[in-house]
C-alpha cells in the first residue's frame, strides 16, 4: 500500500485535493470536506495529515496521531491550529485539522539567513505563541517540541502553533507514562530547541516550553541560534553563554537570558511570566524610563 493518492476520498468524506507537505512519516493534504460542502459551509477546506502506511515505526506513529486528536480536539484558541478529529478508513490513519494559508516561521527565517526579524515582529510572535502555550498549560498540557517549523504565520497576520504530537502532561514520570515512553522510542524531540531536562528524559515542566520559546525569540531577534544549534545538554557541558542581542533593552535581555537558562532552577517557570516581562508594549518602557529597543521597523 502506497501513500494516499490525490483525489482519494478518505473515509468517504475527505477528498484529497493536493499535497501540502511530505515528510518521512506522514503526508499533509489540502482536502475538501464533503459534508461541509453539502452543508454549504463558508469554507469546506481542511488539512489532513495521513500516516504513511509503510513508514518506519508506523504503529507507534499511528498511536501518537490518534492520541494527538484525543488530547487537542477540544482545544479552541486563536493561536493553536484547530484539531477536528482522527480516523481510520480501513487503509489510512489520518488527522483532520484547520487549513492555514501562509508560511512557517522556519520558511520565513530561511529566506533571510543570519538576518533578524524586527523587534516588533519578533515580540508579536512571542506574545501570540505565548498565549497559545499558556492556554495549553492551563489545561495541563506541555507542547514539548516548539520550534520555527511548528509556528505558522497566516496570510492574515495570525500566529498559530502546529504539531502537538509531542504534547504531554507535565510532571509525568517517564517510567510510568506510556506516552512519554512512546515519544522516547520514536525520538521526536528536536535537540536544538529542547531543554537539557527534556533531553535527559526528566519529567516535563512548563519551563521546558519557556526554554524553547526563548530559543525561538533569540533566533528571531538575532538571526542566530543562542547556542550555535548545539543540543542544550551539550551547551551546558561546554558552559556556553549567548551573546546579548543589540536590539533589546537590558531589562529585556535579563528576561530572555532567564528563559534561555540551561539549569531549570535558573529559568523563568511560566510562559505567562516570561511573555509578560519580555514583550511588554512600547509605552511601558517610556513610562518607566527604560531604554527601548533600537529598531521597531
Where are these regions (language model features)?
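C-terminal lobe helix-coil module of Hanks-type protein kinase domains
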Residues: 192-287
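Activation-segment/catalytic-loop signature of the eukaryotic protein kinase fold
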Residues: 86
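Protein kinase catalytic-loop region centered on the HRD/HxD motif
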Residues: 131-141
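AlphaC helix of the protein kinase catalytic domain
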Residues: 106-117
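AlphaC helix of the eukaryotic protein kinase fold
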Residues: 52-74
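Activation segment signature within eukaryotic-like protein kinase domains
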Residues: 125-126
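Conserved short submotifs of the Hanks-type protein kinase catalytic core
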Residues: 90-104
Amino acid at each position: 500500500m502506497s501513500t494516499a493518492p490525490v483525489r482519494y476520498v478518505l473515509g468517504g468524506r475527505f477528498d484529497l485535493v493536493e499535497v501540502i507537505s511530505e515528510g518521512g512519516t506522514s503526508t499533509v493534504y489540502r482536502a475538501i470536506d464533503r459534508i461541509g460542502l453539502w452543508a454549504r459551509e463558508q469554507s469546506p477546506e481542511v488539512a489532513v495529515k495521513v500516516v504513511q502506511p509503510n513508514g518506519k515505526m508506523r504503529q507507534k506513529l499511528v498511536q501518537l496521531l490518534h492520541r494527538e486528536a484525543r488530547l487537542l480536539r477540544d482545544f479552541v484558541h486563536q493561536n493553536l491550529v484547530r484539531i477536528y478529529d482522527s480516523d481510520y478508513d480501513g487503509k489510512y490513519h489520518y488527522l483532520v485539522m484547520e487549513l492555514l494559508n501562509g508560511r512557517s516561521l522556519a520558511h520565513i527565517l530561511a529566506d533571510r539567513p543570519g538576518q533578524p526579524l524586527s523587534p516588533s515582529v519578533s515580540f508579536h510572535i512571542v506574545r501570540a505563541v505565548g498565549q497559545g502555550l499558556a492556554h495549553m498549560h492551563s489545561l495541563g498540557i506541555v507542547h514539548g517540541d516548539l520550534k520555527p517549523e511548528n509556528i505558522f504565520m497566516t496570510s492574515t497576520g495570525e500566529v498559530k502553533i502546529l504539531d502537538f504530537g509531542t504534547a504531554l502532561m507535565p510532571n509525568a514520570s517517564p517510567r510510568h507514562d506510556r506516552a512519554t515512553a512512546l515519544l522516547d522510542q520514536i525520538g521526536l524531540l528536536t535537540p536544538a530547541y529542547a531543554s537539557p531536562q527534556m533531553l535527559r528524559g526528566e519529567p516535563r515542566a512548563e519551563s521546558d516550553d519557556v526554554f524553547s520559546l526563548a530559543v525561538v525569540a533569540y533566533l528571531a531577534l538575532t538571526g542566530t541560534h543562542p547556542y550555535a544549534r548545539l543540543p542544550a545538554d551539550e551547551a551546558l557541558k561546554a558552559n556556553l553563554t549567548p551573546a546579548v542581542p543589540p536590539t533589546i533593552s537590558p531589562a529585556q535581555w535579563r528576561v530572555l537570558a532567564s528563559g534561555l537558562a540551561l539549569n531549570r532552577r535558573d529559568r523563568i517557570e511560566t510562559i505567562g511570566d516570561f511573555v509578560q516581562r519580555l514583550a511588554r508594549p512600547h509605552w511601558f518602557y517610556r513610562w518607566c524610563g527604560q531604554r527601548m529597543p533600537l529598531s521597531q521597523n
